[in-house]
Amino acid sequence: MLIIPAIDIYKHKVVRMETGKKEKIVLEFNNPLDLAKYWEEKGAKALHLIDLQSAIDANDESKSIVRDIVRSVSIPVEVGGGYRSREKIEEAISWGVWRVIVSSILGMELDYLLDLFSKYENKIIPSIDWYDGKVGIKGWQDFIEWRDIKRKIDLLKVREVIFTDISRDGTLKGVNLENIKNFLSLHDYDVWIAGGISSIEDVIKIKDLSENTGRIKGIIIGRALLEGKINWEEAKKIIDAS
């Protein structure tokens, strides 16, 4: 398992939004690049970088910041937020990203997806942004049925997805373990867990679930790390332990 710090960017700033709503910005500060370098110095093995302005407002104003972070750190960076076209995905890949996180394009025609994933299968990872059994797209402003997404993922032969619990994302309410278990029961993919992880106890719960299932690749944490609710060194030690 890995523990990956999350950096959300909106209008050139690092932010945290409750349940992905821009009306609910609960944390905001400058210098996203400084934060990325900080996590690299602290021993993070990868970064999870989301352009919320692109995801929510379809505005690429912050794209240059995302690009500069990818090029300025030596650890792998996965990027997401508004990657809804082949051109934009290919542009991010040209920066040297670890992988591009996609969700909205999963609603597109299967032939288009088959062509895209066949060319970039190791550079694209679907994000299943989960709310009440449906999958959020377009900055979590629209929702589509899970069964439709699963059918396409199965045909694309994807083996890893990110699971984000929208109802807990950015809330510090703690992880909903039953939601995660339920999601794992619906498929056989390996999963990266995000949304609501807010304490060392949450980290331990997911680590235990990983050991029981063998299918959790890692956890993605944002607000709890930024606010000191989770101690980075302690969490990393737990995750790194065999």
UniProtKB/Swiss-Prot annotation:
Annotated localization: Cytoplasm
Catalysed reaction equations from the record: 1-(5-phospho-beta-D-ribosyl)-5-[(5-phospho-beta-D-ribosylamino)methylideneamino]imidazole-4-carboxamide = 5-[(5-phospho-1-deoxy-D-ribulos-1-ylimino)methylamino]-1-(5-phospho-beta-D-ribosyl)imidazole-4-carboxamide
GO cellular component terms, A-Z: cytoplasm
Listed EC numbers: 5.3.1.16
Pfam families: His_biosynth (PF00977)
GO biological process: L-histidine biosynthetic process; L-tryptophan biosynthetic process
UniProt keyword terms in alphabetical order: Amino-acid biosynthesis, Cytoplasm, Histidine biosynthesis, Isomerase
Leading EC class: isomerase
Entry keyword Cytoplasm: yes
InterPro entries found in the cross-reference section: Aldolase_TIM, His_biosynth, Isoase_HisA-like, Isoase_HisA-like_bact, RibuloseP-bd_barrel
Main localization (coarse): cytoplasm
Family per record: Belongs to the HisA/HisF family.
Protein name, as recorded: 1-(5-phosphoribosyl)-5-[(5-phosphoribosylamino)methylideneamino] imidazole-4-carboxamide isomerase
